[in-house]
């Protein structure tokens, strides 16, 4: 896998493990302003690119977010890297938490796909300006409370989504 890393700038290495604790890959996150913020290095080619599988309890609702760093701020959370968000099938009580990017068509499409399938989703309120959970934490927002009050499903999710999206 070393030959796949074509960068020399310092990066944060975020390990991905299987449910059994086996290392399956790494995400290398840029510290600066590189146009390539993330580099995914798969060690096990057919393993899902889901961060936190080794740390969750399936007995409780799982919160499914986009970024590994975001998942560290939430109890019982995993992060889907790359195209894994399109492949994940949440359980009945799991919650999809997409970044707060109502102008991003790809984000809107992923969120709407999950709403259409009846999954529980977070629709960020209009007063939240931050893009992701990490930014919300840095702004001293109570992310747990925001998630609890803004998790929707079915018709209510569709209605909230229609007013949230700008794409």
Predicted regions and their residues:
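Phosphate-handling DNA/RNA-contact segment within nucleic-acid enzymes
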Residues: 1-93, 107
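TOPRIM fold recognition
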Residues: 36, 59-62, 67-167
């Amino acid at each position: 896998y070393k030959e796949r890393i074509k960068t020399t700038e310092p990066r944060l290495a975020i390990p991905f493990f299987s449910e059994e604790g086996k290392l399956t890959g790494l995400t290398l996150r840029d510290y600066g302003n590189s146009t390539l913020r993330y580099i995914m290095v798969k060690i096990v080619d057919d393993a899902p690119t889901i961060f936190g599988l080794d740390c969750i309890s399936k007995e409780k609702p799982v919160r499914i977010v986009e970024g590994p760093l975001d998942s560290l701020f939430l109890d019982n959370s995993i992060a889907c890297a790359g195209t894994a968000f399109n492949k994940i099938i949440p359980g009945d009580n799991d919650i999809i938490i997409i970044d707060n990017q109502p102008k991003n068509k790809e984000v809107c499409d992923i969120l709407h796909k999950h709403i259409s399938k009846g999954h529980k989703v977070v629709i960020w309120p209009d007063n939240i300006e931050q893009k992701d959970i990490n930014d919300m934490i840095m702004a001293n927002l109570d992310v747990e409370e925001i998630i609890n009050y803004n998790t929707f499903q079915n018709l209510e999710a569709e209605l909230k989504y229609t007013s949230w999206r700008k794409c």
